[in-house]
Curated annotation (Swiss-Prot):
It comes from Chromohalobacter salexigens (strain ATCC BAA-138 / DSM 3043 / CIP 106854 / NCIMB 13768 / 1H11). Located at the top of the head of the 30S subunit, it contacts several helices of the 16S rRNA. In the 70S ribosome it contacts the 23S rRNA (bridge B1a) and protein L5 of the 50S subunit (bridge B1b), connecting the 2 subunits; these bridges are implicated in subunit movement. Contacts the tRNAs in the A and P-sites. The keyword Metal-binding does not apply. GO terms for biological process: translation. Belongs to the universal ribosomal protein uS13 family. One of its GO terms (molecular function) is structural constituent of ribosome. This is Small ribosomal subunit protein uS13.
Length: 118
């Protein structure tokens, strides 16, 4: 297994699909990385040479991925909550942020139903 950005990517899959195992890299960005490095997206990772894996590693290093990206998103949410803006309050209460109705839906965001206490 090749290790890129702290993630063991699977050997038996295509290079473009294997790159999507890294948090912050989806199908489109994986295709762009393969095009930039000159590696065929359909090439299996186990068939790549060590130099090709190094070029992939260097190209992925240009993007914000994995721990840095997770930290950035949590800090952005924390900043909204500290500001006390509408989106921050919705994050704090665990409700939808983008104007969805909450009277009947939003069960995923609100969690399981709580019984009515008398």
């Amino acid at each position: 297994m090749a290790r890129i950005a702290g993630v063991n990517i699977p050997d038996n899959k295509h290079a473009a699909i294997s790159l999507t195992y890294i948090f912050g890299i989806g199908r489109t960005r994986a295709q762009e990385i393969c095009a930039a490095t000159g590696i065929a997206p359909t090439a299996k990772v186990q068939d790549l040479s060590a130099e090709e894996v190094d070029t992939l590693r260097n190209e992925v290093g240009k993007y914000t991925v994995e721990g840095d990206l997770r930290r950035d998103t949590t800090l952005n949410i924390k900043r909204l909550m500290d500001l006390g803006c509408y989106r921050g309050l919705r994050h704090r209460r665990g409700l939808p942020l983008r104007g969805q109705r909450t009277k009947t839906n939003a069960r995923t965001r609100k969690g399981p139903r709580k019984p009515i206490r008398k």
